């Protein structure tokens, strides 16, 4: 199977097989980024220790911690992250996740748009 299947009524992605893309928090494997989809995308993100504070004007992001531990900075407040933690980040919230061996699932709504990523 290819790393993404796109059909009229469904799509399937193998996140581990998608090439990583640099992002403010580390490396991201982005699924459902095709033209046929505008609802949301799904990203498997490996978080770095030196992640960059940023924000979005349009996107809401949902984070779910899959592996590791670390913390997330949300508008200047630090909150711990561990396996099973979920975070909802609204537009305008300046944020960054920080960790070592920290892996999250990120669901941007609507679909991720690089033009909606701003340094804080």
Question: What does each model-identified segment do?
Answer:
Residues 1-40, 120:
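A short, N-terminal "cap"/entry segment at the start of jelly-roll beta-barrel domains
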Residues 43, 66-67, 82-83:
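A cytosolic small-molecule/anion-sensing beta-strand core signal
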Residues 76-92:
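Short acidic-glycine-tyrosine-enriched beta hairpin
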């Amino acid at each position: 199977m290819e790393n993404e299947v796109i059909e009229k009524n469904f799509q399937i992605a193998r996140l581990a097989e998608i090439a990583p893309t640099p992002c403010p928090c580390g490396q991201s494997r982005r699924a459902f980024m095709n033209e046929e989809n505008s609802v949301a995308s799904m990203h498997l993100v490996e978080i770095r220790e030196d992640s960059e504070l940023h924000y979005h004007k349009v996107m809401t992001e949902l984070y779910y911690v899959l592996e590791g531990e670390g913390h997330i900075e949300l508008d200047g407040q630090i909150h711990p992250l561990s396996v099973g933690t979920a975070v909802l980040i609204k537009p305008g919230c300046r944020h960054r996740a920080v960790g070592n061996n920290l892996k999250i699932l990120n669901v941007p709504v609507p679909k991720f748009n690089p033009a909606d990523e701003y340094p804080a």
